[in-house]
Design a protein with these regions (language model features):
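Short acidic alpha-helix initiation/capping motifs at coil-to-helix transition points
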Residues: 40-46, 113-117, 197-198
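Histidine- and/or cysteine-centered catalytic micro-motif in compact active-site loops
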Residues: 71, 141-144
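Helix-hairpin-helix/helix-loop-helix acidic hairpins
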Residues: 57-60, 72-128
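Structure-specific DNA junction-binding interface
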Residues: 1-88
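Residues that form generic nucleotide/phosphate-binding pockets
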Residues: 50-54, 67, 71, 102, ...
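C-terminal accessory module of base-excision DNA glycosylases/AP lyases that mediates lesion recognition
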Residues: 1-29, 137, 144-229
């Protein structure tokens, strides 16, 4: 049996490969996440570490966005360019901070998730250039996910407050095309807030049935490993 690497979350098969030098060359210095791995391999835990620093006031929201997009784009050549365009749309980070403010609360409800999604979707509020739902749901996931602590364990993205709360998850084409009809998501890319929330409820239900985290359901779906009951 193949052992899961120490850095991997349950359900995470492999790290994302990134070309660090290309990203460093393209990005403004203030946006580079402090202490971010320079190995060229990124696990979800690495991005959650930046999210934890953001929650604690030790990282800016621009640094969080960069960490998310480096992981999200991976080795895709236009990733750094598109990330710079997004950053230029919010040079002081105020639009992103406004979108994510509800996710910083110790306890947040479904309405906070809906509001964050809608703000990032609306150009009149917080939508940034080159940042559609396939990417901004990654930001919502890393900024807002609360992992149920097992045996008192702690760490990035881990808190006992995760129990019972609806968790934000990634919704991109890789996920959407594998979801069953009962998940409530249309094919396409410009999903409505109601579709995202329907998917979150579906994933939460599947996670409860299987005794796993909701993001493990998302990973299984995106990798084509999800099996229906």
């Amino acid at each position: 049996m193949t052992q899961r690497p120490d850095r991997a979350l349950p359900g995470e098969v492999s790290p994302i490969t990134v070309h660090i030098d290309r990203w460093r060359t393209a990005l403004p210095p203030d946006a580079w996440p402090d202490g971010f791995p320079d190995s060229g391999l990124l696990w979800r835990r690495d991005v959650f570490a930046v999210a934890q620093a953001w929650h604690a006031g030790r990282a800016s929201v621009r640094q969080l966005l960069v960490a998310v997009l480096m992981w999200g784009y991976g080795p895709i050549g236009y990733g750094p360019w598109r990330t710079v365009r997004a950053l230029e749309g919010d040079p002081d980070g105020k639009r992103l901070a406004y979108a994510l403010e509800g996710l910083r609360a110790p306890v947040r409800d479904e309405e906070a998730l809906r509001t964050a999604y809608q703000r990032l979707r609306d150009p009149k509020e917080s939508r940034l250039p080159r940042l559609g739902p396939a990417l901004f749901t990654k930001l919502l996931y890393f900024a807002g996910y609360r992992r149920a602590a097992a045996g008192g364990a702690s760490g990035p993205g881990t808190t006992a407050l995760g129990d019972g709360q609806l968790q934000p998850l990634i919704l991109d084409p890789a996920v959407a095309r594998q979801l069953p009809a009962e998940a409530g998501v249309r094919r396409g890319t410009e999903w409505l807030p109601a579709e995202w929330l329907a998917y979150l409820h579906w994933a939460a239900d599947q996670a409860r049935r299987r005794g796993v985290e909701p993001d493990e359901v998302e990973m299984a779906v995106s990798q084509g490993r999800f099996t229906h009951d």
